[in-house]
């Protein structure tokens, strides 16, 4: 079966979303599909690509920036020429008359269309973002029901059975275990504990709760050191806010920012750290149930972690600590106590999700429901 994985942006090596998409594509191929990837390549010029082939050259400058958002005839032509029967679209909150025309034409070609909404609901995420981002949401809200009317199924990581009157396929975020290195070093934590937060930093990650907790912890002049390592870029306003908290809390010696890391550099940080920090403020965007990528990466790496949402894949695991879904500072003493109570080694932690949460397992659920396609 010929399939197209369609995204409306490009790839970045350090970006967790890029890694996820590549893992999903790999999984679809492992399930037996002939998959091509449609994406944007942006350097000096703007190109729409199918794998390594340019299907549209938008040039450069302001007109190129406009064309890449409104011109999709090259995609329609490709799907028709190659007789693509299954299209998997990663939603980018970009419903508008042009993307509506795209999915309408794809449906006219008798394609089965599946739309992944990475986070749902997402409207309240925008309340923390600058005005330019809010304009994206307003346009999306105006057109999204018309957009999804041409979609057969919506893939969601929530428990919703329908979204905007379209039936859903409920899956978990998965892991490509071959690409995630298991932690091999058990650090000496008798005198210090290293925490790790990996994210494209937004308010709902709630790392400020750790920072405020550290500020309170160090007011007591403890002998035991706790250091927080933050990996990833983020919304500038949020990062600036974190840096103010660090300065005001006098904890600059105990918090380290690294920016985006991938490959061996990221592996090195995981070896150095002992516990993962998941999302601690999903309540800010009105989300309770979610199955985040980061929780799964922490488990695949083999480290215990904390979070505050409801994640059904981990709720009863002995290596996770649930925090309250509020804005209170994280109690660092309790965090240390929890870490010392975990008895599982990295391999044992990883083994708890090894079969269920592979991307091949999750994407096979999508194919079987969307295409009524029995995999061997």
Locations of regions flagged by a protein language model:
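N-terminal subdomain of nucleotide-sugar transferases
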Residues: 1-44, 82
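Nucleotide-sugar-dependent
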Residues: 15, 94, 205, 264-269, ...
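Membrane-proximal helix-turn-helix segments that form the acceptor-binding/catalytic region
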Residues: 26, 73, 97, 101-108, ...
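Short N-terminal targeting/anchoring amphipathic segment
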Residues: 76-98, 111-114
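Donor nucleotide-sugar binding/catalytic pocket of nucleotide-sugar-dependent glycosyltransferases
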Residues: 137, 141-183
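Conserved donor-binding/catalytic core segment of Leloir-type glycosyltransferases
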Residues: 187-214, 229
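Nucleotide-activated donor-binding/catalytic signature segment of Leloir-type glycosyltransferases, i.e.
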Residues: 232, 240-268
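A charged, aromatic-enriched C-terminal amphipathic alpha-helix characteristic of glycosyltransferases
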Residues: 326-330, 334-375
């Amino acid at each position: 079966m010929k399939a197209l994985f369609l995204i409306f942006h490009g790839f970045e090596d350090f970006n967790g979303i890029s890694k996820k998409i590549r893992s999903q594509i790999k999984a679809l191929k492992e399930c037996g599909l002939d998959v091509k990837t449609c994406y944007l390549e942006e350097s000096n010029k703007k190109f729409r690509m199918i794998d390594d082939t340019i299907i549209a050259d938008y040039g450069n400058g302001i007109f190129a920036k406009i064309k890449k958002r409104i011109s999709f005839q090259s995609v329609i032509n490709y799907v028709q020429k190659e007789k693509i029967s299954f299209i998997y679209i990663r939603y980018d909150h970009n419903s508008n008359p042009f993307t509506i025309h795209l999915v309408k034409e794809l449906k006219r070609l008798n394609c089965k269309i599946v739309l992944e909404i990475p986070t749902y609901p997402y409207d309240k995420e925008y309340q923390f973002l600058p005005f330019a981002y809010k304009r994206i949401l307003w346009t999306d809200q105006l057109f999204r029901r018309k957009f999804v009317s041409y979609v057969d199924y919506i893939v969601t990581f929530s428990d919703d059975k329908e979204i905007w009157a379209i039936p859903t396929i409920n899956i978990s975020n998965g892991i490509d275990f071959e690409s995630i290195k298991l932690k091999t070093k058990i650090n000496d934590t008798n005198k210090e504990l290293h925490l790790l937060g990996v994210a494209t930093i937004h308010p709902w990650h709630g790392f400020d709760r750790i920072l405020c907790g550290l500020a309170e912890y160090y007011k007591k002049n403890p002998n035991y050191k706790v250091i927080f390592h933050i990996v990833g870029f983020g919304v500038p306003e949020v990062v600036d806010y974190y840096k103010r908290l660090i300065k005001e809390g006098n904890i600059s010696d105990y918090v380290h920012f690294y920016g985006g890391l991938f490959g061996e550099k990221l592996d090195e940080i995981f070896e150095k750290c002992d516990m993962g920090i998941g999302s601690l403020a999903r309540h800010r965007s009105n989300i309770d149930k979610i199955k985040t990528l980061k929780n799964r990466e922490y488990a695949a790496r083999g480290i215990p972690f904390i979070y505050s949402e409801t994640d059904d894949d981990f709720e009863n695991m002995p290596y996770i600590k649930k925090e309250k879904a509020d804005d209170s500072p994280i109690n660092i003493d309790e965090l240390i106590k929890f870490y010392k109570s975990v008895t599982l080694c990295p391999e044992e932690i990883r083994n708890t999700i090894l079969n269920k949460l592979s991307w091949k397992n999750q994407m096979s659920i999508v194919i079987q429901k969307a295409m009524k396609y029995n995999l061997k």
